[in-house]
Design a protein with these regions (language model features):
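Structural preference for beta-strand elements that scaffold enzyme active sites
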Residues: 1, 25-31, 51-54, 92-96, ...
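Acidic (Asp/Glu)-rich catalytic clusters
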Residues: 15-25, 42-51, 83-90, 116-122, ...
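Glycine-rich, proline-tolerant flexible connector loops at the mouths of alpha/beta enzymes
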Residues: 1-21, 57-70, 98-103, 127-138, ...
Length: 187
């Protein structure tokens, strides 16, 4: 419903939604985006009453090294620590692998190393986005099938972007490949 650390007003809105959801028995269905920031996002979300965090990690070597200026090994350590910190706070964790589509296309070894290193972590869903909308249905199906076959015990979601009007086709391809969940917007 929101990203952590945006503003005090945003935190108040998250708190109001979380309180409503808890009163209706839907507390575990309210998710918010958090960051790998040493617990700052987790504290912000916890104060707002959010019980499910979608942690944003880097799904490509380019984003890891270029944006974070971290080695893949260091980023993996940071992600694992953030996951465990969230669980220690009583939160359920999903992991959003930003730029996953480019990771699979240009640095699949990076994606596999991240998933190998987190396969035993307490993550409910691994979210695989086509962040820049670069996929076509053929690559989507191939990349998604690869992950399902390599990691049969993990739950994968596909998150399409519609830059080139392929979001529906790519989502169908992810489902055909065996992905367990999809993210959609209905207008």
């Amino acid at each position: 419903i929101a990203s952590a650390r945006v503003s005090q007003g945003e935190q108040q809105a998250v708190r109001a939604i979380a309180e409503w959801a808890a009163a209706k028995g839907y507390a575990d269905r309210v998710e918010a985006l958090g960051f790998i920031d040493g617990g700052v996002s987790l504290d912000w979300l916890g104060t707002a009453g959010c019980r499910v965090v979608n942690l944003l990690a880097k799904g490509s070597r380019k984003h890891c090294e270029g944006q974070l200026r971290r080695t893949p090994e260091r980023h993996l350590e940071d992600v694992r620590a953030e996951i465990l910190a969230a669980v220690d706070r009583g939160m359920k964790v999903n992991l959003y692998l930003e730029d996953w589509s480019n990771g699979m296309r240009r640095s699949p070894d990076y994606v596999y190393a991240m998933l190998d290193g987190l396969a035993d972590a307490p993550v409910s869903r691994f979210m695989c986005p086509d962040t820049l909308g670069v996929l076509d249905p053929y690559d989507t199906e191939r990349f998604c099938r690869d992950l399902v076959e390599r990691y049969p015990s993990l739950h994968f979601d596909f998150h399409a972007h519609n830059d080139y009007d392929l979001a529906v086709a790519n989502t169908a391809a992810a489902v055909r490949a065996g992905f367990h969940g999809v993210h959609v917007t209905v207008n």
